[in-house]
């Protein structure tokens, strides 16, 4: 038995493979199972070119054999095996891919799904083992060979005994220490979970001897344990099956099996794309919002597979943030992986797949809104806020993508409506899309600012979430119709001549009110929007009163204030009391003015600056 050295700085490269390339030691099993699958594929390919050979898929499988006494883990396959020369060339040279060499020698086109690319997957075994033994017999050969290495001082190759072709890879596990428990890779539950997680859709059976329990023969309650060989993996991915043969239960069960959620999804999409990009995907739109969805702990992303092998549990690059609620998987052969297969190289194919998925999701939501309104409203109740964040984020870059998916409660319809539905039934003389902002629909219905708009027969959209107005400010208009808050200074309804006349006639009292309130307001003016209320607040400029409330509640509050205007109903009886007070008792006039302003603040849901002063003012009136 001859001791051989690793070729061409392979020792140094092996150290890099073991300590730098792989960040997660548990993926060693994924790599070795993928290699075993490739080895069986090569046998299948050999039989295609030789009519004297047959390939019965039922005869080919991968076996995982833990041995707790010897602390070894064996991965066996009935694949093509290796000759002595191939052992020396493939395992003696780090980063030489035997699979790529096989494809080249046999002139196999890229459509043949061999997983291996880089020739380093085998060496991931050294993440958990301090010695690896390989016993292999090549397809059609008479002799078997043993390759053995500790990953440090080269390797040995010697003749061995093996009845049939294929390969056994025996991992001699490292000793446990304070940081690592390598014995866990001998436990049945751990091996099953790793196979299901990473290699569930390998096309050949992955078998494991499983301990089970049964009632002992001849007894009623006495149980005995027995060992039975079990196929752990599913083999055929749901996304590669004909969608016409699948039922809703198939998709719903897969949703639960993958732990995307514990209830039924609202919608599923089964996508198969071939062309410039090729991928298969199953996507789900959940009905209910995850408990942590609006927290920093929530991670968006789709499970990403390459040739049925899990590459990433959550590939965030496949989903824009505003569709981050979507769950599912994507499988593609066109991905450029890095050498560890743990991460993707940033390439055009991934971007194309992501763009295509984004379009598919949007189309599905639009279809749901049009054809299944009840389901869409369920979805929107859970995730509508996220769509509105999408409009607002990135300086409105995605507003055109999302605007048709938005919905708001309507004063006229008493239900949720889309912007398209609102615009479609606008009156001919209506200039704006009107909206009102408040904590709830009930609160908005009591707002004094809505009176004039409703009297004109115009519809008002109710904004009850903190993001609503910010999103609409970014959207600016819809189908060339601008948005207008009922609390804005100019509603586009009032007669300018009448307003000007009333403000001129009451110039003195308005100036006195402004003087009494000082910098709290920017102006006092006559209101044409009020009927039953004496006063209300409106705003001028880009920052509305509601936006001020939201911004002031934020931790990094910059003290942004709306330019408040106190609007006065000159037809209200309180206004006559104001005029009398101005003529006869300036202190009482100032008191009335402050009380009316504070009343307007309370109606808007704003805090009174000095509650003690406010209660004292009320007491003065009661004396």
Curated annotation (Swiss-Prot):
Protein name as catalogued: Chaperone protein HtpG
Keyword ATP-binding: yes
Organism superkingdom: Bacteria
Species, as recorded: Clostridium perfringens (strain ATCC 13124 / DSM 756 / JCM 1290 / NCIMB 6125 / NCTC 8237 / Type A)
PANTHER family named in the record: HEAT SHOCK PROTEIN 90 FAMILY MEMBER (PTHR11528)
NCBIfam families: PRK05218.1 (NF003555)
Region listing for A, in residue ranges: 1-341
Pfam families referenced in this protein's UniProt entry, alphabetically: HATPase_c_3 (PF13589), HSP90 (PF00183)
């Amino acid at each position: 038995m001859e001791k051989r050295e690793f070729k061409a700085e392979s020792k140094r490269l092996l150290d890099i493979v073991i300590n730098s390339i792989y960040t997660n030691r548990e993926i060693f099993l994924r790599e070795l199972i993928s290699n075993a699958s490739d080895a069986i594929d090569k046998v299948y390919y050999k039989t295609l070119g030789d009519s004297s050979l047959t390939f019965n898929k039922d005869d080919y499988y991968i076996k995982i054999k833990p041995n707790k006494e010897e602390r070894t883990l064996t991965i066996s396959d009935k694949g093509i095996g290796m000759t002595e020369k191939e052992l020396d060339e493939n395992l003696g040279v780090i980063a030489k891919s035997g699979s790529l060499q096989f494809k080249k020698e046999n002139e196999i086109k890229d459509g043949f799904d061999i997983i291996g690319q880089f020739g380093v997957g085998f060496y991931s075994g050294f993440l958990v083992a301090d010695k690896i033994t390989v016993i292999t017999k090549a397809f059609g050969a008479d002799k078997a060979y043993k390759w053995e290495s500790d990953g440090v001082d080269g390797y040995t190759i010697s003749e061995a005994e093996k009845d049939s072709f294929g390969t056994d890879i025996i991992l001699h596990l490292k000793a446990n220490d304070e940081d690592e428990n390598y014995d866990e890779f001998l436990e049945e539950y751990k091996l099953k979970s790793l196979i299901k997680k990473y290699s569930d859709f390998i096309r050949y059976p992955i078998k494991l001897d499983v301990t089970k329990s049964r009632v002992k023969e001849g007894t009623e309650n006495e149980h005995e344990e027995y060992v039975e060989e079990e196929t752990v993996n599913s083999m055929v991915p749901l996304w590669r099956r004909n969608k016409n043969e699948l039922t809703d239960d198939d998709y719903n069960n897969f949703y639960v099996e993958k732990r995307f959620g514990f209830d039924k999804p609202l919608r599923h999409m089964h996508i198969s794309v071939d062309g410039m990009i090729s991928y298969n995907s199953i996507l789900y739109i959940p009905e209910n919002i995850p408990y942590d969805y609006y927290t920093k702990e929530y991670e968006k992303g789709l499970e990403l597979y390459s040739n049925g092998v899990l590459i990433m549990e959550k590939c965030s690059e496949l989903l824009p943030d505003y569709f981050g609620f979507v769950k599912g998987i994507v499988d593609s052969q066109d991905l450029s992986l890095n050498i560890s297969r743990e991460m993707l190289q940033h390439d055009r194919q991934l971007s194309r797949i992501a763009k295509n998925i984004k379009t598919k999701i949007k189309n599905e939501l639009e279809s749901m809104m049009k054809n299944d309104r009840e389901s869409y409203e369920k979805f929107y109740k859970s995730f509508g806020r996220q769509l509105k964040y999408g409009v607002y984020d990135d300086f409105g870059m995605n507003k055109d993508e999302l605007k048709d998916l938005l919905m708001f409660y309507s004063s006229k319809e008493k239900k949720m409506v889309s912007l398209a539905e609102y615009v479609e039934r606008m009156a001919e003389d209506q200039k704006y899309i009107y909206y009102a902002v408040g904590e709830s629909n009930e609160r908005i219905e009591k707002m004094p600012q809505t009176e004039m708009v409703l009297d004109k027969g115009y519809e008002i959209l109710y904004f009850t979430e903190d993001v609503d107005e910010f999103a609409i400010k970014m959207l600016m208009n819809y189908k060339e119709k601008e948005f207008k808050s009922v609390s804005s200074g100019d509603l586009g309804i009032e007669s300018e001549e009448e307003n000007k006349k009333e403000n001129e006639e009451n110039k003195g009292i308005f100036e006195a009110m402004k003087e009494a309130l000082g910098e709290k307001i920017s102006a006092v003016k006559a209101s044409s929007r009020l009927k039953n209320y004496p006063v209300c607040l409106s705003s001028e400029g880009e920052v509305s009163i509601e936006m001020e409330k939201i911004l002031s509640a934020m931790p990094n509050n910059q003290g942004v204030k709306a330019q408040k205007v106190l609007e006065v109903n000159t037809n209200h009886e309180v206004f006559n009391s104001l005029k009398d007070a101005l003529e006869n008792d300036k202190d009482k006039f100032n008191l009335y003015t402050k009380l009316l302003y504070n009343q307007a603040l309370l109606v808007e849901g704003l805090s009174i600056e000095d509650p003690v002063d406010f209660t004292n003012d009320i007491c003065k009136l009661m004396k």
